[in-house]
């Protein structure tokens, strides 16, 4: 979503600047500097591009009522990517709060790969009033051209997942096409495929790598190079799945199983942004089971079938976070807040008994933590109004809120000498960093690096001639 927000901002600013409109467009995410976030609350832009998590945090400030009082509309791009999960739950609750602050606010959702449009209409509608949501269907473009890449011997290996057998053929495709976007399912595989391609890059073609653990500067540099048409190939993860529009891409390669027809269509859609010409994609299975998955996905795309997760009741852990965010913004009456959140499809099912359980959990931390004062987050006064137990609870909430599970990460920085860290390259997980010692080498951010020192949650490195390891990362299980 960060890459999508940055790309939409760039695409909006170009016509705004050309026309000379006095319109400010800004992003707000984990990449946004604290000083800009603070300024946005006192001098908000005309258009704010953000994520569900950042919006929820923004609503936790007391000035959020004044900030959003004049909100005209909220546009949810690529709604299929998160509406059915916990990020969708968080956004659904934020929508109910925004609707309470700005009742005339209009809701708009966009997607090119919906399997169940009626379900999304109901999710978007306040109080489930589906008739208030108009479904607008765009013109269908040329059907995608999807093929499965096979070894020269026409036998896919029995085992393995990296598809290293295909590296010479991948490089040949890169040479034949103007710009190639290569998708992998993990950050480890993105670095691994990049290193293997670089080893056979006899023409020294400009090839980049992009994933969520790289530093903001590294990601923006690669995104800018792609937007300017300076790269011949880019190896990426789901960090570039959503709606990033680079017109020069004429081929998409999917390494490994595509994990569904909708996901595959989303990635194919990054190529050839013209309705009258098909997007081209090659699926590269790592083993024979992935070949079967790739075949099924190709047949589904050819037949115009979509898949995706079904809507389910909203998570109570997300609801507890929302209650805490509301308490940070202002004291609340439990009956009024319950009526507000029931306006969303995700939480229309919450009855009084469930609501009291959630409030009790936020109040005490639950039966396992109620003996500890720091988990007593909210209290109810004599008039039945809930408020923060202490002002410090607001800062604790904003520091720890979110529904994306993260592992402990260490910064990777170029050593500036004398034990000082210089430019940041990104982050690796603590468990990987714990396996490193000074002198060890590993591949990261498209470079071979040697460990100089580990200190203060940082891995100080310098350039190396060879690498032996690639960082691996924990994450959500693939479908």
Question: How should these model regions be labeled?
Answer:
Residues 370-479:
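Conserved nucleotide-binding/hydrolysis modules and their immediate coupling elements
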Residues 1-329, 334-383:
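Helicase motor core with emphasis on the C-terminal RecA-like subdomain
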């Amino acid at each position: 979503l960060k890459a999508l927000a940055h790309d939409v901002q760039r695409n909006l600013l170009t016509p705004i600047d050309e026309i000379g409109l006095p319109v400010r467009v800004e992003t707000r995410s984990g990449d946004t500097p604290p000083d800009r976030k603070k300024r946005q609350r006192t001098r908000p832009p005309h258009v704010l591009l953000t994520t569900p998590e950042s919006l929820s945090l923004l609503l936790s400030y007391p000035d959020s009522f004044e900030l959003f009082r004049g909100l005209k509309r909220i546009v949810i791009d690529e709604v299929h990517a998160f509406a059915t999960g916990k990020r969708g739950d968080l956004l659904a609750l934020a929508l109910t709060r925004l609707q309470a602050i700005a009742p005339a606010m209009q809701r708009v959702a966009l997607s090119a790969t919906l399997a169940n449009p009626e379900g999304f209409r109901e999710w978007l509608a306040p109080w489930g009033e589906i008739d208030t949501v108009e479904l607008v269907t765009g013109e269908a473009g040329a059907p995608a051209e999807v093929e499965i890449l096979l070894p020269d011997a026409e036998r896919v290996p029995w085992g393995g997942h990296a598809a290293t057998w295909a590296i010479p053929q991948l490089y040949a495709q890169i040479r034949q096409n103007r710009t190639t976007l290569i998708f992998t399912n993990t950050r480890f595989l993105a670095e691994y495929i990049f290193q293997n391609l670089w080893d056979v890059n006899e023409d020294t073609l400009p090839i980049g790598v992009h994933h969520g653990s790289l530093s903001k500067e590294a990601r923006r540099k690669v995104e800018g190079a792609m937007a300017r048409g300076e790269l011949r190939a880019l190896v990426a993860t789901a960090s570039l799945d959503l709606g990033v529009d680079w017109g020069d891409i004429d081929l998409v390669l999917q390494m490994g199983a595509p994990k569904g027809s909708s996901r595959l269509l989303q990635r194919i859609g990054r190529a050839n942004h013209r309705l009258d010409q098909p997007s081209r994609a090659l699926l590269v299975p790592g083993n024979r089971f992935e070949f079967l998955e790739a075949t099924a996905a190709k047949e589904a795309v050819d037949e115009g079938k979509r898949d995706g997760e079904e809507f389910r009741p909203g998570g109570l852990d997300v609801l507890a976070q929302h209650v805490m965010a509301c308490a940070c913004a202002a004291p609340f009456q439990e009956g009024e807040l319950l009526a507000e959140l029931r306006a969303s499809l995700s939480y229309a099912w919450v009855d009084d008994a469930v609501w009291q359980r959630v409030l009790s959990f936020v109040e005490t931390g639950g039966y396992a933590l109620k003996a500890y004062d720091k988990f007593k987050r909210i209290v109810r006064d004599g008039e039945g109004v809930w408020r923060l137990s202490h002002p410090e609870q607001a800062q604790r909430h904003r520091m720890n809120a979110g529904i994306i599970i993260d592992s402990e990460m260490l910064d990777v920085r170029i050593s500036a000498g004398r034990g000082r860290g210089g430019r940041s390259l990104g982050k690796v997980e603590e468990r990987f960093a714990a396996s490193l010692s000074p002198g060890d080498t590993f591949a990261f951010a498209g470079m071979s690096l040697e460990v100089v020192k580990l200190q203060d949650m940082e891995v100080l490195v310098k350039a190396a001639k060879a690498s032996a390891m690639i960082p691996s990362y924990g994450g959500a299980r693939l479908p």
